[in-house]
Amino acid sequence: MRRKASERPLYGTRRRGADGYPTGDASGDACFGIIRGMKMHLSVKAPLSAAVFLVAIIKAVSVDAAGVSVPNTMYDHSDPVDLPKLLEGRDGRRIATAEDWEKVRRPEILDFFTRNVYGIRPVERPNDLRFESIGEDLDMPGIDAIRKRVRISFSGAHGAWGFDACVFVPRSASPGKPVPAFLLICNRSMARFADIDRKRRTEFFPVEEMLRRGYAAAVFRNTDLAKDDYHPYFSANGVAVIQDPPFTNGFYACWAKERTETSWGAISVWAWGASRVLDWLETVPGIDSRRVAVVGHSRGGKTALWAGATDRRFALVCANDSGCCGAKLNHVAVSMSETIRQDNNNNPHWFCRAFRQFNGRDFVLPYDQHWLAALVAPRLLYIASASGDAGAGPWGEFLTARHASPAWTLYGNDGLVEDGPYRIEVPFHVGRVGYHLRKGDHDLTLYDWSRFMDFADRHLR
C-alpha cells in the first residue's frame, strides 16, 4: 500500500546490508549530510539553492585512476573543527605523563562514556560464572584443528541466563606452546557467516586462514546475549527488552527490573559478553590468553572498541567499518556518513537513554571518538575502513586513529605512523595503532583479516 506523503521519510531511505547497517548507497540522508558539511565549511546558514545542492552532489564523490569511488577531498579530507582535547583533564590540567593518564585522564574518559553513551553495568564477572562444555571436543582433520564449544552461564538477583561460544585451536598448540587468538563478535547469522561446522566457509570468519597462520579462532553471536532490534518497551525503560518482556526472562532480567537513564544498552552487553568469552579462553589449554584480539564489524566494531576500553586483557582491538559512535570522528564534515541522531533513532537499544542528549550536536560535542580509541593505549589498536562505505565515514575513522595516537606517546610508543599516503590498500602498520582503507563496501573480508593478522604478526608475536 502506498504511504501518504506525510508518512514518508523526510530525507529518503537507505539500502541496508546483510547485517542491517546502511551501505554506502544512500539517498536523502546522504544528500542531507553533504549539505550539512558544506554549511559547516562555508559558514552557510541560509537554505542552499537547488543549483548549489546539485554541485554538492557532483562534487561529493570523485574517481581515482583505478576507477574506484573515493571521498572528495573538499569534504572528506578536511581537518576536524574545535576537536575536544584528549590530553587535558576535566579541570583543565595538562596530561603530560603515562601516570597522569592512568590516574586522571583515563578514568575520566571511561566514566564519561559509561554514564553518557553505553550505560552502567550492574556487574562485571559474576561470582557464579560457569563454563559447561557442549559435547566432546571435535577433531577436525580437514582444517587441522580441535573445535571446542561451551555454554557460558551466570545468574543475578532476578534470574539466570547463558550463551554459547566456540573456538578452533590449532592441533599444534599445547600448554607449553600456546598460540594467540582472534575473537570475533559475530553480528550476523552464524549459519551463513560463521558456520562452526565449517560446511559453509566465508570471508567474514575465515577460520582456515587464521589456523594456517598460527592463530586460534573464537566466535560468539552477539544476539545470544541481547537482541539487536528496537522494542516499543524501550521508550519506557531505557533499553530494548531482551527475550521476553517485560523483563520476566532473558539477559537483562538477571540484574534489573526497571531501567534508568544510565542503564546499559546492547553494545555494552555484547562487549560484556566478549569479556566473558575471554574468561573462558583463559582456561583453554593451548591458548595464550595474554595475546587475544577482539574483532568486530559495523555495530560489532563499536562493540569491540568498548570491549577493549573496558577490559584491558584484550591485547589487540580491531574495529572494522565501525562508523558513527564507533571509530568515526564527529567534529569533521564527512559527507554521507551516519549521525548520532540517526543511530539513536534507528537503534536506541544500543545505548543508554542519556546518550540522546547529544542528538544533533555532532559538531559541538564535548568529547569525540578519539577519546574512546585512546582508552586502548598502550595496547594495540586497529581501525579499518572501506572506500565504498560512505555511511561509516572512512576519513573520520582515519582521523580517530590519528588523533588518539598521543595517548600512546605518553608511554613512549608510536601510535599511528603515517609512513605512506592515505590511499586505498596502503596499510599503516609501523606503530601500535594500525589502519587501512580497503577497496569495497561495508563488509568484513579476507583482506581485512589478512591485514589484522599482518599487524598481529608484527606486534603480538
Regions found by a protein language model. Give the residues of each.
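Mobile cap/lid helix-loop segments that gate and shape the active-site cleft of serine hydrolases
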Residues: 276, 319-372, 397-420, 427
